[in-house]
C-alpha cells in the first residue's frame, strides 16, 4: 500500500478532476490524504480520501472558491496569495509530511505549497494540471493580452519580493517560472489528450496526458424534445442576469428543450415567467445533462469544455476570461465549436442553429471524445502516480 498526499486550491475546476483519481487510488487499496479547504470537504471525503483542512492554519487568507478561480488569472494576486499561503502552512505541512512520510505528493499546479514542500523535504512529486500544460511553445498559442503583460511587468518588483520570502524560509524557488510552469523533468499529470493540448509534441515524456477524469452522473435528466440545448456560465463568475434573460428570449419560440444553469446568485423570480420549453435551475448535474445534450452554450472553462467534448457535444463558445478564451480558441481551431461574437438574442439563436445544422461540429467533437477515451483517464493517472511513488 502506498501513501499519497494531494494538495489543491479551493476551486471546483481544480478539485473535480482529481476526485476520480482519488477514487481509483482508494479502490486499489492505497491511502490518500487530501489537504484543501472546507468548501471542498464533502466532495473530497465522498471520493474516499482523508480530508485535512488548511483553513485553521491559513487563517489570514480565508481562501474561497472565488479566490481559487482568480488564482492563475491575475499573476500578482496569484503570487502573493500562494506565497502567503505557503508560509502560513509551512510549519503544519512540513511537520505533517515528516510524520506521515508519504510515498508521493500530488499538488495542483497552483497549490505551490505542495510542490515547495516536496522539494524542501525530498518527497517524490507530481504536478496535477487541470488546464492546458504550459511551456514556451504553448505560451505562444495561448497569448496574454497587452494589458495583462503590462500588469505583470509592473508587478514584478512585488512578485520578486514575495519569492524572496520563500527563499528565506528554505524553499528552493529561483524565479516566477518555478511557480507558473513545470520543466521537462517534472512529472506532470494533464487532464486532457495530446490531440486537444496545444503543442503537445513539445512536452517531454514526464507529462502524462490522461484525458478528463469524469465522475458518474448522480441524476437522470429527461429529454422531452428532439433537441436539448444546455446553457451554463460555470460555478464562479456566473452573476449574468441580463445574459440569461437574453438566452430565454432567444429560445422562447424555438422547438428546443433548454436547460439553463444560473448559479446560486440569481433570483429565479428575476428571470420572469419561463416558456414551457425552458427550465432554469441554480444548479444541475452537468454530467447528466451533457449525456443528453445536443449543444452546450458555455463559458469555456477547461472542465466544462472537456466534459462537453467527452460526451461528443459541440459547443457555442462564450468565454469570460483570457484563460477561457484560450480554451475556446482551441475548441474552435479543432472545429468542435463556434464562438459567439455578440450576446444578443438573434446572435445566440443563429450560433446554436449553425452548430446544430452543420454536422462537422458534432463529428469533430466526437473525434476529440475518442482521443480522450484513448488516454486512460483516472486509471492512467493512478498508474503514473504509483510509478513515481515506487521511486521513493
Which residues does each predicted region cover?
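Catalytic donor nucleotide-activated moiety binding site of glycosyltransferases and closely related
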Residues: 235, 245-279
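Ser/Thr-centric signal marking residues that sit
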Residues: 8, 192, 232, 261-262
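Nucleotide-activated sugar donor-binding and catalytic core shared by glycosyltransferases
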Residues: 1-33, 39-50, 95-99, 104-107, ...
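Nucleotide-sugar-dependent glycosyltransferase catalytic domains
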Residues: 2-3, 30-229, 233-256
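Short glycine-enriched loops at secondary-structure junctions
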Residues: 10, 57, 131-132, 264-265, ...
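Short glycine- and Lys/Arg-enriched binding-loop motifs that mark or flank ligand-binding interfaces
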Residues: 9, 207, 230, 259, ...
Amino acid at each position: 500500500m502506498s501513501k499519497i498526499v494531494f494538495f489543491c486550491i479551493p476551486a471546483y475546476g481544480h478539485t473535480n478532476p482529481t476526485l476520480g483519481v482519488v477514487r481509483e487510488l482508494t479502490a486499489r487499496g492505497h491511502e490518500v490524504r487530501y489537504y484543501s479547504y472546507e468548501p471542498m470537504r464533502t466532495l473530497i471525503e465522498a471520493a474516499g480520501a482523508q480530508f485535512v483542512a488548511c483553513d485553521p492554519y491559513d487563517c489570514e487568507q480565508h481562501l474561497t472558491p472565488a479566490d481559487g478561480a482568480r488564482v492563475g488569472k491575475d499573476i500578482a494576486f496569484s503570487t502573493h496569495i500562494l506565497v502567503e499561503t505557503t508560509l502560513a502552512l509551512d510549519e503544519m505541512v512540513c511537520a505533517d509530511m515528516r510524520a506521515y512520510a508519504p510515498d508521493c505528493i500530488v499538488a495542483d499546479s497552483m497549490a505551490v505549497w505542495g510542490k515547495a514542500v516536496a522539494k524542501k523535504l525530498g518527497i517524490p512529486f507530481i504536478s496535477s494540471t487541470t488546464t492546458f500544460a504550459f511551456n514556451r511553445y504553448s505560451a505562444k498559442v495561448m497569448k496574454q493580452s497587452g494589458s495583462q503583460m503590462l500588469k505583470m511587468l509592473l508587478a514584478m518588483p512585488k512578485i520578486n519580493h514575495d519569492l524572496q520570502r520563500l527563499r528565506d524560509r528554505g524553499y528552493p524557488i529561483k524565479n516566477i517560472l518555478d511557480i507558473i510552469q513545470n520543466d521537462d523533468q517534472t512529472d506532470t499529470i494533464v487532464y486532457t489528450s495530446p490531440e486537444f493540448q496545444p503543442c503537445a509534441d513539445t512536452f517531454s515524456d514526464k507529462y502524462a496526458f490522461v484525458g478528463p477524469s469524469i465522475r458518474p452522473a448522480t441524476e437522470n435528466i429527461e429529454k422531452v424534445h428532439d433537441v436539448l440545448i444546455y446553457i451554463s456560465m460555470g460555478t464562479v463568475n456566473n452573476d449574468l442576469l441580463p445574459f440569461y434573460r437574453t438566452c430565454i428570449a432567444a429560445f422562447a419560440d424555438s422547438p428546443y428543450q433548454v436547460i439553463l444553469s444560473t448559479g446560486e446568485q440569481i433570483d429565479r423570480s428575476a428571470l420572469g415567467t419561463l416558456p414551457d420549453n425552458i427550465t432554469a435551475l441554480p444548479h444541475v448535474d452537468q454530467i447528466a445533462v451533457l449525456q443528453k445534450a445536443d449543444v452546450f452554450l458555455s463559458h469555456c472553462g477547461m472542465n466544462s469544455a472537456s466534459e462537453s467534448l467527452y460526451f461528443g457535444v459541440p459547443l457555442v463558445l462564450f468565454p469570460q476570461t483570457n484563460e477561457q478564451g484560450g480554451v475556446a480558441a482551441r475548441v474552435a481551431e479543432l472545429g468542435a465549436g463556434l464562438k459567439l461574437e455578440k450576446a444578443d438574442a438573434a446572435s445566440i439563436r443563429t450560433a446554436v442553429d449553425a452548430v446544430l445544422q452543420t454536422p462537422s461540429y458534432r463529428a469533430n467533437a466526437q473525434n476529440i471524445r475518442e482521443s480522450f477515451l484513448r488516454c486512460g483517464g483516472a486509471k492512467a493517472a493512478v498508474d503514473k502516480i504509483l510509478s513515481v511513488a515506487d521511486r521513493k
